[in-house]
């Protein structure tokens, strides 16, 4: 039976977190103490130092040889059940899509265990002699950081790769045998690597197979160079050394944007290949009008074709120009105009990489602002769009996921924490005091700073409920009803009973995790829904978890 003293212990553990969040919110919204730039600096510090060191502290002090495998099995089974049901829904339902699979999986299975779960569950079940609820929450955090967040990145990059292939290679994707991604591109979403656009170059060999190179567009490169104070475009944009001799190059570039934009075609490299003598004629022809397509340059070697385009190009002009030039038809799709979303400042504060990346193309879909639907649409003959071989897509996705992981400080803190805990508890080695205190001086402030940062984020948003009341209600139902229900079923299935079962259910009813929102904003997959789940969910999480705590204790 839950007593008043038990409730007081719970409030003692949780209310200070809400005090820090409220102070941050008031400092921005009411008192105007912090400017958006100052909030960005605070949140950047939290994302890069406070939270990773807090994770390292909890993980490194947890005994990996005393982990409750049955509890972890219940958590894993819950996520696998949800993932399987969502995949089945996407396969059988016309309304199912990869976007909604990712969003619903995040809402139902990825709570804010590190910041809210550890202090809340410690306050609720501190009196349980045979159960260390804090240690159980740390074990959940380890799985989240190492396995489930990595799975989320895999799904997001898979989505980005599908979108890139479907837009740029709608008819010839099955002929792609390899992808090469430049080192400065760290994401396939919305241009990746902090650029507004991606440029894809396809080389077609004698066997008809395509080898695609993905890089930042030259226009975005020149803009970045100009922003760093280069003297001129010609000085900042040195042409790449080309090993092509006598190849045919088709550059088809048009834009839906009404404002002029620098072309992504590298004229310097083009004229180095075909000769400088025709430079004036080519420029004159290019300026003559959009109705004329570039003519292919016939060289001595005709066994290789290179197609260069930008992800923002118009599909209509590309198809017409390709037909006029007699080129192989490999163009299709195109990105929509990029708009600056309100609250983008707040996203930068939580981002671990791509800090200057803009939102990708958006499309209204069920009241949210996710990017285009990724379910392949059937053509007139009912045939679905072909995709590259699974091995090619898998290698591309793994490369991009690896680049994201190595730029995330939480990856290092989690892995180092696990390694140190294994060494420490296996051989009884203690961390040197000078290192331990250097870490603790920041990790001790991690919880408070994380909640303070969340309050700043809430204050910077124009609306608490950004996705509309109906979608917000739907998201809250998934977060606080569906997630705990599936966790209860999974826990009972693996044999959890008593206090362990209660902890598993209450843990599943925690507010939405922040990291899934960061991913959703970066990849533009229903960010408004995840934003509402984080903000509004945090406000109603305490009474909801208390209701679960009281009902389970009856």
From Swiss-Prot:
Q: Where in or outside the cell is it found?
A: Membrane
Please indicate if the UniProt record lists Transmembrane helix as a keyword: yes
Q: In which tissues is it expressed?
A: Expressed in roots and shoot apex. Expressed in roots, stem bases, stems, leaves and young panicles.
Keywords attached to this entry: Auxin signaling pathway, Membrane, Transmembrane, Transmembrane helix, Transport
* Membrane among keywords: yes
**Membrane-crossing residue ranges in chain numbering:** 7-27, 39-59, 69-89, 101-121, 136-156, 415-435, 439-459, 476-496, 499-519, 534-554
What GO molecular-function term can you cite, just one?
A: protein homodimerization activity
Membrane topology, as annotated: Multi-pass membrane protein
Q: What processes in GO biological process is this protein linked to? A: auxin export across the plasma membrane; auxin polar transport; auxin-activated signaling pathway
Query: Topological domain, Extracellular: which ranges?
Result: 1-6, 60-68, 122-135, 436-438, 497-498
Superkingdom in the source lineage? Eukaryota
Cellular component GO terms, alphabetical: cell periphery; endoplasmic reticulum; plasma membrane
Q: Which positions are annotated as binding (indol-3-yl)acetate? A: 51, 112, 114, 149, 514-515
Q: Which residues lie on this side of the membrane: Cytoplasmic?
A: 28-38, 90-100, 157-414, 460-475, 520-533
Q: Where is composition skewed (Polar residues) in this entry? A: 228-240
InterPro entries under this entry? Answer: Auxin_eff_plant, Auxin_Efflux_Carrier, Mem_transp_PIN-like
- Segments for region (Disordered): 214-240, 275-298, 352-385
Q: Name one Pfam family in it.
A: Mem_trans
Q: What does this protein do?
A: May act as a component of the auxin efflux carrier.
- Name the protein family: Belongs to the auxin efflux carrier (TC 2.A.69.1) family.
Instruction: State whether it acts alone or in a complex, and with which partners, per the record.
Output: Homodimer.
* UniProt protein name: Probable auxin efflux carrier component 1b
């Amino acid at each position: 039976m839950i007593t008043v003293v038990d409730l007081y212990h719970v409030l003692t553990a949780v209310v200070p977190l809400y005090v820090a969040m409220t102070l941050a919110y008031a400092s921005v919204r009411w008192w105007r103490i912090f400017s958006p730039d100052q909030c960005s600096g605070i949140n950047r510090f939290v994302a890069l130092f406070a939270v990773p060191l807090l994770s390292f502290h909890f993980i490194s002090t947890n005994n990996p040889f005393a982990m409750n495998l049955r509890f972890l099995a219940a958590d894993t089974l819950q996520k696998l059940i949800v993932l399987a049901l969502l995949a089945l829904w996407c396969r059988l339902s016309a309304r199912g899509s990869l976007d909604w699979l990712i969003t619903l999986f995040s809402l139902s299975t990825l709570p804010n265990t590190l910041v809210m779960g550890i202090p809340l569950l410690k306050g609720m079940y501190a009196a349980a002699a045979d159960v260390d609820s804090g240690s159980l929450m740390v074990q959940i955090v380890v799985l989240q950081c190492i396995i489930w967040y990595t799975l989320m990145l895999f799904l997001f990059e898979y989505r980005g790769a599908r979108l890139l292939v479907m837009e740029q290679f709608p008819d010839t994707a099955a002929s792609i045998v390899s992808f090469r991604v430049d080192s400065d591109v760290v994401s396939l979403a919305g241009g990746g690597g902090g650029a507004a656009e991606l440029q894809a170059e396809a080389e077609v060999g004698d066997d008809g197979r395509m080898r695609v190179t993905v890089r930042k567009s030259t226009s975005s490169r020149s803009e970045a160079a100009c922003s760093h104070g280069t003297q001129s475009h010609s000085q900042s944009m040195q042409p790449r050394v080309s090993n092509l001799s006598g190849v045919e190059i088709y550059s088809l570039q048009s834009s839906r944007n009404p404002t002029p934009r620098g072309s992504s075609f590298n004229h310097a490299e083009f004229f180095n290949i075909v000769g400088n003598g025709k430079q004036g004629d080519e420029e004159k022809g290019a300026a003559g009008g959009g109705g004329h397509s570039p003519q292919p340059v016939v060289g001595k070697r005709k066994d290789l074709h290179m197609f260069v385009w930008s992800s923002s190009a118009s599909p209509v002009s590309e198809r017409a120009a390709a037909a006029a030039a007699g080129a192989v038809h490999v163009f299709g799709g195109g990105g929509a105009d990029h708009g600056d979303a309100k609250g983008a400042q707040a996203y930068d504060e939580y981002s671990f990489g791509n800090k200057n990346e803009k939102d990708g193309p958006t499309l209204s879909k069920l009241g949210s602002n996710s990017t285009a639907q990724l379910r392949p649409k059937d053509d007139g003959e009912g045939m679905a769009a072909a995709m590259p071989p699974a091995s090619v897509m898998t290698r591309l996705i793994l490369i991009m996921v690896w680049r994201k992981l190595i730029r995330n400080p939480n990856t290092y803190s989690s892995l180092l924490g696990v390694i140190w805990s294994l060494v420490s508890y296996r051989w009884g080695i203690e961390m040197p005091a000078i290192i331990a205190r250097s870490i603790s001086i920041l990790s001790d402030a991690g919880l408070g700073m994380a909640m303070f940062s969340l309050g700043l984020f809430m204050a910077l948003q124009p609306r608490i409920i950004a996705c509309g009341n109906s979608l917000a209600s739907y998201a809250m139902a998934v977060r606080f009803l569906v997630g705990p229900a599936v966790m209860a079923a999974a826990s009972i299935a693996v044999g959890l009973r008593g206090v362990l079962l209660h902890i598993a259910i209450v843990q599943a009813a925690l507010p939405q995790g922040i990291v899934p929102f960061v991913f959703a904003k970066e990849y533009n997959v229903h960010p408004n829904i995840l934003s509402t789940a984080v903000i509004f969910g945090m406000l109603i999480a305490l009474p909801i978890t208390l209701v679960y705590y009281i009902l389970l204790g009856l």
